[in-house]
Regions:
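N-terminal capping/lid subdomain adjacent to the active-site entrance of alpha/beta enzymes
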Residues: 5-179, 205, 301-359
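A short pocket-lining beta-strand/turn micro-motif at the edge of beta-sheets
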Residues: 62, 257-261, 284-286
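Short helix/strand-capping turn motifs
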Residues: 283-294
């Protein structure tokens, strides 16, 4: 086995044979066109998502995953593809650490379920989803309280609103949530100027809860506005949405704020790229949101990237041909992803010609 984090050291066993048996030409150093389309249900609805789909393939440097959410158009999905191509064709920078601290992720579930998930994770940090459509602030308070009890006074609890609140609603919610000694609130409002205004109001109120920016980084034409407007205390970086490990390292260096590395709800194939980023960062002051494979009902590798004692080990992965076969998407889904890939290639061609968004 190669040292932790070295690119390209994935073993695939009988994967090529499995792919051929499904009528999909297996990728051996080519690209996503010959990859395998997977479909894996989630254990619990997560921000409206009940199933994850994506494409995996093996390039010259290793395995890669391309899995932009279905509501992402070509103008965003091509950036995810660029990240996957880095994993497949180039590999990742050398790591500076062998393990990465991680949080557990608690969906918008009942308090009893939230408590059990937090205890069962073995993590000392939890990220709790709040502001779920169809729920009330009281639901959030009960869920966060349950997680706080599960982790005890020394645990870290952060919440994520995914931009669902306006400034007034965020201020009101945080005033109540602050009693649970939050580590930070992730993306309470959708827009950068709203985050900046919220931070000013919280400071005037004497509420010392930190603000983290996620969507304002990964879905922005200018991620650095977060720092320029003093809109956040922490930034969340996700490898696929931001175009790869090296692109994220550049943002981390330039933005001048503490970084948390999180997943985009991928299989272990995609999580491994996030782990490579977390392992390569010079400083890692917070637990990372990379322990999300337990939210899936299945995976694509023999030994999934699941936390032990609140940490993930930076290690090589072995793709499981039986799991690949089990997760193979039906033909209509495969065709939809082929169409999507063609649209993304067109968008990438436009980017290379100087039109559109460049990250």
């Amino acid at each position: 086995m190669a040292p932790p984090g070295r690119p390209g050291r994935w073993q695939d066993g009988r994967v090529a044979g499995v792919a051929r048996s499904m009528g999909v030409r297996h990728s051996t150093g080519t690209g996503p066109e010959s990859g395998l389309v997977y479909e894996i249900p989630l254990r619990t609805r997560f921000r409206g998502v009940t199933v994850r789909q994506g494409v995996v393939w093996r390039g010259a440097a290793g395995w890669a995953e391309w899995s932009p959410f279905l509501d992402y158009g070509p103008d965003e999905a091509w950036i995810w593809l660029r990240a996957a191509m880095e994993s497949a064709d180039i590999g990742w920078p050398d790591p500076v650490r062998a393990t990465v601290p991680v949080n557990c992720t608690i969906p918008a579930v009942d308090p009893e379920v939230a408590y059990a998930m937090a205890v069962g994770s073995g993590c000392t940090t939890a990220k709790v989803k709040v502001a779920e459509q169809g729920q009330e602030l009281a639901d959030d308070l009960n869920r966060v309280e349950a997680v706080r009890h599960a982790l005890g006074p020394t645990g870290q609890v952060r919440v994520d609103a995914n931009g669902a609140w306006d400034v007034d609603a965020a201020r009101a919610a945080i005033r109540q949530l602050a009693r649970f000694d939050l580590e930070y609130v992730e993306q309470p409002c959708a827009h950068v100027d709203e985050l900046a205004e919220l931070r000013r109001r919280l400071a005037r109120d004497g509420i010392g809860v930190l603000i983290a920016a996620d969507e304002s980084i990964r879905r922005s034409n200018d991620p650095y506005r977060v720092a320029e407007l003093r809109a956040a205390d922490v930034v969340v970086l996700k490898v696929q949405p931001l175009g790869g490990v090296r692109a994220c390292l550049q943002i981390a260096e330039r933005i001048g704020l503490p970084v948390v590395v999180s997943s985009a709800l991928e299989t272990s194939v995609g999580i491994r790229a996030g782990l490579a980023l977390a392992a390569a960062l010079p400083q890692l002051p917070y637990a990372c949101g990379l322990n999300t494979v337990p939210l899936l009902t299945d995976d694509l590798v023999e030994a999934s990237l699941v936390a032990t004692g609140g940490h993930l080990t930076v290690r090589d992965l072995v793709v499981d041909p039986l799991r690949l076969s089990s997760a193979a998407a039906p033909s209509d889904v495969v065709e939809a992803w082929r169409t999507r890939l063609r649209e993304v290639h067109h968008a990438m061609a436009e980017m290379q010609s100087g039109e559109g968004r460049i990250v």
